[in-house]
Amino acid sequence: MPEYPTALGASSKDAITLLGHDLANDVMGEVGFGELAFWLATQRRPTPGETRVFEAVLAALADHGYTPTAIISRLAHLSAPDSVQGALAAGLLAGGSRFLGVTEDCGRFLHDVLEDAGALPTDDAGWDALALETVRRQREAKKFVPGLGHHVHKDGDPRTPRLMAIAAEEGITGPHLALFAAIGRVHPEVLGKTLPLNGAGVCGAALADLGLPLELLRAFALLARTAGLIGQLAEELRHPVANDIFLSVDLNNRPVDPDPYEPPPVGQDSL
């Protein structure tokens, strides 16, 4: 008979174990949800400091107002009010490279730079030099630096200094956060303007410094946003706006002449 080993949940007639512990007696009422999420992903119990940083990330990413993920969830619930799971899933599926995906993109970007750097800097001057080289390379390649800039918080994202402070208080400021902070200091020399380090980016740096799998960084952002979407749906039930959003489009659309698609000439980049 085939076997399917797992260190996660397992059940017998009289007990349920999770991560090798009795679920009812050792986990329920003893382990917070954020701590448990970290533990499930890494199969090691986080320290109190790691838990504090991780839960600060979850709080930072839970909700950011009427973003596309929130609007889509509300509209999906308007269309199918009998399917709360569909409304939640619709919002989560909207998480991507523009919204929520920056957490993963920034964590991976910083990690790749650090892997290529060899010996890591030991002081701010060294980090600034590495950051300057990194920003210049991105500029020459005509690429953005993930985590740099925000369409609303143009003068500074309040989540960024707070998360950096929490990580420092817990002794968890690692190379990813150090490089990200240095990028914030030196990028004006290359770009000629000052952009904020955004909250999604600093969350990616913090998650990477916690040693969490890079492949799951977006999953943690989605975990956080799940709570936010539940809040959006709860508010929609009491104070609905989705129908107004729908009607604002439905009542204000206007017919225009067709705009036939023309493929680009052969040899040019496709759309």
Language-model features: locations:
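Non-transmembrane, aqueous-exposed alpha-helical and coiled segments at domain scale
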Residues: 1-271
